[in-house]
Amino acid sequence: MQSPERITPYDTECPKNEQVEAMFNHIAGHYDRLNHLFSWGMDRVWRQKAIRMIEPFAPHTVLDVATGTGDLAIEICRHIPSVKQVTGVDLSLEMMRIGEQKVRSENLDNRITFMQKDCLDLPFADHSFDAVTVAFGLRNFQNIKLGLEEMYRVLNEGAPLMILELSRPVSFPWKQGYNFYASHVIPVVGRFLSQDAEAYTYLPESIAAMPQREELADLMLSVGFREAYYRSLSLEVATVYMGLK
């Protein structure tokens, strides 16, 4: 199995972060609809369950990494009353432009701001945030360990990192059903609806390549988190990870 850093959307010599930026800029207008479609609407449920895991920490400031179109940032503001400010960072300007429209429609533009930044080089001081979140974005990092180190760095002491990510089921028959769906359904439907064949071939490949469950929890511990654990969701097709600084 290839390392996640070697799995890229396009067959070019460009660095992974540049390819990921180009991919999301291209599919931004289709992203939300396809996200809901391919997850059978469960992506909303997964976000709500993930948010409940950081709510007890009553954060005031949250950094949402790989914020995309802002779905998680918006849900955080809706469901965690203590949150005063969410800063969303992403490589893709087109995704964040859609996010800005959604934020304005929710009258949350005084609580959510967007910045085009690389998660591997965050422009924030150490100990800047009460929580850091990343949903469906970790597998797109050019270097997952470096990304974890950066998110750890900007967290306050005792604060949580919450990662929500797609995962490969390991139990029968969910594993077999998922493999068929990921290999045959997602690429075909994604290519038809988004007009980007590579983007929805990359999706299942990037899920398969990234560290999961115990491996990712161990990686979180290795960069300094004093505690790391995870919870599987919906027949193992999604996982929430928590790391405490």
UniProtKB/Swiss-Prot annotation:
In this chain, S-adenosyl-L-methionine is annotated as bound at T69, D90, D118, C119
Q: Does the keyword S-adenosyl-L-methionine apply?
A: yes
Q: Give me any GO biological process, just one.
A: menaquinone biosynthetic process
Please name the top-level EC class of this enzyme: transferase
Q: Write one Gene Ontology MF term.
A: demethylmenaquinone methyltransferase activity
Q: Which reaction(s) does the protein catalyse, per the Swiss-Prot or TrEMBL entry?
A: a 2-demethylmenaquinol + S-adenosyl-L-methionine = a menaquinol + S-adenosyl-L-homocysteine + H(+)
InterPro entries of this UniProt entry?
SAM-dependent_MTases_sf, UbiE/COQ5_MeTrFase
Q: Which UniProt keyword terms apply here?
A: Menaquinone biosynthesis, Methyltransferase, S-adenosyl-L-methionine, Transferase
Gene3D superfamilies found in the cross-reference section: Vaccinia Virus protein VP39
| Any single Pfam family the record assigns to this protein | Ubie_methyltran
Q: Quote the EC number.
A: 2.1.1.163
Q: Determine if DNA damage is one of this entry's keywords.
A: no
Pathway per its UniProt entry is: Quinol/quinone metabolism; menaquinone biosynthesis; menaquinol from 1,4-dihydroxy-2-naphthoate: step 2/2
What PANTHER family does the record point to?
2-METHOXY-6-POLYPRENYL-1,4-BENZOQUINOL METHYLASE, MITOCHONDRIAL (PTHR43591:SF24), METHYLTRANSFERASE (PTHR43591)
- Chain's role: Methyltransferase required for the conversion of demethylmenaquinol (DMKH2) to menaquinol (MKH2).
UniProt family annotation: Belongs to the class I-like SAM-binding methyltransferase superfamily. MenG/UbiE family.
According to UniProt, the name of this protein is: Demethylmenaquinone methyltransferase
- The coding gene here is menG
